[in-house]
Amino acid sequence: MVEISSISQTLRALRRKQYSCRDLVESLVSRSESATHLNAFAATDWLHLRNEADRVDRNGSGGVGLMGIPLCFKANIATGIFPTSAGTQGLLRHKPAIPAKIVERLHSAGALIGASGNMHELSFGITNDNKTFGPARNPWNQALISGGSSGGVAVSVAANLMLGGIGTDTGASVRLPAALCGVVGFRPTFGNYPTDGIVPVSPSRDTPGLIVRSVEDAVLLDRIIRNKCPTQNMSLKGLRLGLPRSHFFDNLEPHVAAASERAIRRLATNQMTFVEADIPNVAELTRKVSLPVAIYEFPRALMAYLSFHGIGNTFDELIQNIQDPQVYDLVQSQLSKGLISESVYRRALRCYKPRLKATYENYYSSNGLDAVLFPSVPLTAKPVGLQTTLVHNGVETDTFGIFVRNLDPSSNIGLPSLSVPVSLTPDRLPVGIQIEGPFGSDDMVLAIGRAVEEMVKFGQEY
C-alpha cells in the first residue's frame, strides 16, 4: 500500500520510481472503497482510472508536470467522463462531451481525472448535506458536516482518497470545507481561472478553486492552470499584515479564538509586522452585495447554461426536481415572488460593490498593508442535519451567515484568498486561518501561506 502524501511529495516518489502510477491508484481506490460512508464522491470509474494509470506507466509522463496524479473534480465541473450533475436530480444524465477548460489544462499537464466530488445541491449551501448522494462527512468526526458546497472534494483530500481537487467558490465554497476538514483551500483572483464548462451560480463571482494538502501543492496547480513560470522565493521580511479585529474576530468560538491567537503569536516571530486595523462598514456593504447578486443571477445563469447545452429538461423541471428543501424554497422565492428585484440587483452592482471595492483598496493603501489575516470560519464543524439556524455561543444564529461571515466579503470583489489549517481544538477539530491580498496578489498570498504552514506545523500540537 502506497503511503498517501501531498502531490509534490508523490511526484518526487514517482520520478524516483519508488512506486508506479498503478500502485498509487490502487492505494487510492482501496482507501476510497473502505471510506464509502464518507460520501466523498458523486461518481467514480475505477476501471477507467486504472487504465489511465497503466497508460502513464507504459508511456511515461513525457516530462509533463503532474505525471499521473489523480484529482477529484467537483460535480458541477465537466470532466468528459462523469456526469456534470451539480448534485441535483435533474442533471444526473448531463454529460458534456467537452471537458471544462480547467480540466483540460490539468489533464494536459498529466493529471488524471480521479473522481467526481459530492457537493451541496446546485452549489447553493454550505453543509454539503446532499439528498441524492448523501451528506459528505467530515473525516475528523463523521457525525459532522464537511462544509460546502465543495465538501466532497475537501473530504477526498482530507481522508487521503485523492491527492488534490478542484472545487468552485462563489462566496466561500472552496475555503469553508477546506477549513472545516483541515486542508488548504485557495480562491484565486477573479478571472485568473477559466469558468467554461461549469454549472454556474453567480457569474460575476464564480471561480474554480484549489483544495489540496499543502500550500506547495496549491502553488504547483496554480502555476499549471495559469500557465506561468515558477516564481522565485519571495522574501517576507518586512511584510505588513492587517488584523481586522472588528467583524472578523468577533463572536468566535472560544477554541477557534484561542487557536487563531496562538497562530498569530507564532507568526509574529517571522519578521512580518501585524497591524491592528479594521475594515470599515464591511458587514453592511457585504450584506448589500452578496446574496442580492447571487440570488438574482442564479436562475438566469442556470437557464442560460441549460439552453447552451441543449439539455432536455426545462428549467422548471430541473427546479421541481430539487431535493434540498432550503435550495428549492430559495429558488422558488426568487422565481415566484421576485425575492431580489432588478433595481436591487443593479444597485448592488453599480453602487455597493464599487463602494466595497474602494473600501478594501483604501484599507490596504492607508495602512500600508500587503495582506490581511483572520480566522477562516468563526466556528468548527457541526453535526450533519443542520437547520437554517443553530446555537452559536449561546445565541440562536443564522447557519449560513455565520459559516460564511469571514470568507464572503472579499469574494464579492474578486480578491485572492487562502485558507490554511493552523490548529486542532482539544476535541481534534481543525481551525483555519485565511490570508487575503489585494486584487492580483495571488503569488504574495500563496507565499505568506507557505510561511504560515511552515511556522504553525498543523496537527502537531496535540
UniProtKB/Swiss-Prot annotation:
Belongs to the amidase family. This is Indoleacetamide hydrolase. Pathway: Plant hormone metabolism; auxin biosynthesis. Keywords: Auxin biosynthesis, Crown gall tumor, Hydrolase, Plasmid. InterPro entries: Amidase, Amidase_CS, Amidase_dom, AS_sf. The active site is at K74 (charge relay system), S149 (charge relay system), S173 (acyl-ester intermediate). Hydrolyzes indole-3-acetamide (IAM) into indole-3-acetic acid (IAA). The keyword Lipid metabolism does not apply. One of its GO terms (molecular function) is hydrolase activity. GO terms for biological process: auxin biosynthetic process. The keyword Lipid biosynthesis does not apply. Disulfide bonds: none annotated. Its EC number is 3.5.1.-. It holds the Pfam family Amidase.
